A protein has these predicted regions:
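Terminal accessory carbohydrate-recognition/targeting modules of carbohydrate-active enzymes
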Residues: 1-267, 271, 297, 304, ...
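Flexible, solvent-exposed coil segments and beta strand-coil junctions
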Residues: 111-115, 339-342, 486-488
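Conserved oxyanion/phosphate-binding beta-strand-loop segments in alpha/beta enzyme cores
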Residues: 259-296, 409
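Long, well-ordered core segments of solenoidal/helical folds
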Residues: 276-287, 317-339, 381-399, 413-414, ...
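Alpha-helical support elements that line or immediately flank enzyme active sites
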Residues: 297-330, 503-515
Length: 516
């Protein structure tokens, strides 16, 4: 029994099915994202969205969608769906959906009269390529499938308007065609495992709307280019694979490529397996190293999010090697910043004052999940560098005072995760002594002392850490614990912010807390 399955009643009800979105990534920054009925509801949605290094590595939508049509006895049955001006949905392909499940890969089952057709989508790991396998499960008469590619070739946060600047040519390649609408973009190769018939039928499809953008009050209408369509006859029991990528592929390799990729997938047969799959979607591996993307479809690599999410996205799902490889990339950028002040080109926010503290916290989780011995062997040098860097007041915006408490300046630029800005100023200007910064600092000192406890060469370092711990324990309580039994959010001079925020939960939830 599939853990994630939606039946016909839900799928044909757009009020229920459109809000349900799915995401597939290749762990190299490319993704496929849409609603479970295949109707794009955001401008960031697309069948193939890839980062382009020559364009600041921002994600660009190359292939927005692929509309399928089942043809029997000359009668077309359109399986696609788009929203057009005025809230009109056309074609209404969702009415043919009988089931959607996502146990190993997203699979949609359509029924058109006597025809039962399944569609399964899979992203190739580490490659900018998506495969879609169509299987004709049942048919009582000759059947042909027609495919119309909707091309965008735009940055994922922009919209495309009909224009005359595009390159309309489609180059014939093995079992398909290749297209590149604008200079500077990679060529999109659209190929099949079976030889299709290509019909050149270029049109702009105008006035496509994205309802989520409409609700957000941002631009939501665009025009998409459809250069023509493919036609492929299919027999009962037969499967056809469609490939979209930025490199040409041998059509004969598509079946083997699909089977190899699906064999490596974790079935979503439980809530844990769903979380495991979701965690791995955010891995980003390229020539610069291994990273964690902060979110799709508009996330980037952020230092704080990397260290905060690293244990949960790796150690919690038994991916120790991924923790170590991502930590190696992130810690190298952190050490470079601590040594030279040079910002990272890939990991944004490496200069924020709490980043070293979250790095130590992530290593602490490694010690708990793997072993203290392993953590000491791999990360003791890094922990020592971080502690000394902070104690020597080398960070430009994190200062240690006489009570071993740390303060920061956040009046003009946000320094914590509460980083919303309005009119060039932080919405909440948290400045001075921040409760979670000091709790993280206390925790880091205690952990560093524990990690170096049996290290004869680091006894002086161990004693120094414990001295700082003893120095700040009572001042922390005196500064943050108020008469109402909870913690102030931050203290700046004579002002103590009484706002109840989750930052105090960090302070009480750490392994070592000055409140113990």
């Amino acid at each position: 029994m599939s853990y994630l399955k939606f039946d016909k009643n839900l799928m044909i009800n757009l009020e229920q099915s459109l809000p349900k979105e799915m995401l597939r990534t290749n762990q190299s920054g490319a993704y496929h994202c849409t609603s479970i009925v295949g109707c794009n509801t955001r401008k960031q949605h697309g069948l193939l969205v890839i980062p382009i290094p020559e364009m600041e590595n921002k994600p660009h939508v190359l292939l927005s969608s692929l509309d399928e049509t089942v043809i029997q006895h000359g009668a077309p049955f359109n399986l696609g769906i788009h929203r057009y001006s005025g809230g009109v949905y056309s074609p209404n392909g969702h009415k043919y959906i009988r089931e959607f499940d996502c146990e190993s890969v997203p699979r949609t089952t359509y029924r058109v009269g006597g025809v039962i057709l399944t569609k399964e989508k899979i992203f190739i790991s580490g490659e900018n390529r998506i495969l879609i396998r169509y299987t004709l499960v049942e048919a009582h008469s000759p059947t042909t499938l027609q495919f119309r590619p909707f091309l965008a070739f735009r940055e994922s946060n922009e919209l495309c308007m009909a224009n005359s600047s595009l390159n309309t040519a489609c180059e014939e390649v093995s079992n398909g065609v290749a297209s590149c609408l604008y200079n500077g973009y990679p060529t999109l190769y659209m190929q099949f495992s079976h030889k299709p018939k290509w019909v050149n039928d270029p049109h702009w499809y105008n006035g496509i709307e994205y309802v989520k953008d409409l609700e957000r009050g941002v631009p939501y209408t665009e025009d998409l280019w459809v250069p023509g369509y493919f036609e492929v006859p299919i027999k009962k029991g037969e499967s056809i694979i469609f490939s979209a990528g930025i490199k040409e592929v041998s059509p004969r390799s598509l079946n083997k490529m699909y089977e190899k990729e699906i064999a490596s997938r974790t079935c979503r047969s439980s809530f844990y397996n769903c979380l495991k799959n979701a965690a791995k979607q955010f891995y980003l591996k390229d020539k610069d190293g291994d990273f964690i993307l902060s979110g799709y479809p508009w996330g980037t690599v952020l230092a704080r999010n990397t260290f905060m999410s690293l244990p949960g996205t790796t150690l919690a799902i038994d991916h120790k090697d991924d923790f170590e490889s991502i930590m190696a990339t992130a810690s190298a950028e952190l050490v470079k910043y601590m040594g030279t002040g040079e910002l990272s080109a890939r990991i944004h926010g490496i200069d924020l004052p709490d980043i070293p503290l979250w790095a130590v916290w992530a290593i602490q989780q490694y010690a708990k999940n793997i072993s203290t011995t392993a953590a000491h062997e791999k990360y003791m040098d890094l922990v020592e560098k971080i502690i000394n860097y902070i104690l020597e007041n080398n960070h430009p915006n994190l200062q240690v005072d006489g009570n071993a408490m740390v303060s920061t300046i956040g009046t003009s630029t946000p320094v914590s995760w509460m980083n919303s800005m309005m009119w060039g100023k932080p919405v909440v200007p948290r400045t001075g002594y921040l409760v979670e910064f000091n709790a993280l600092w206390y925790n880091a000192l205690r952990f560093a002392a524990m990690l170096s406890e049996n290290d004869e060469e680091r006894q002086e370092f161990h004693d120094m850490c414990m001295a700082q711990v003893e120095k700040m324990a009572q001042p922390f309580v005196d500064m943050f614990l108020n008469d109402y039994g909870y913690l102030y959010d931050y203290v700046n001079g004579t002002y103590a912010d009484p706002s109840v925020r989750p930052n105090m939960a960090i302070a009480i939830g750490l392994d070592y807390s000055p409140l113990d």
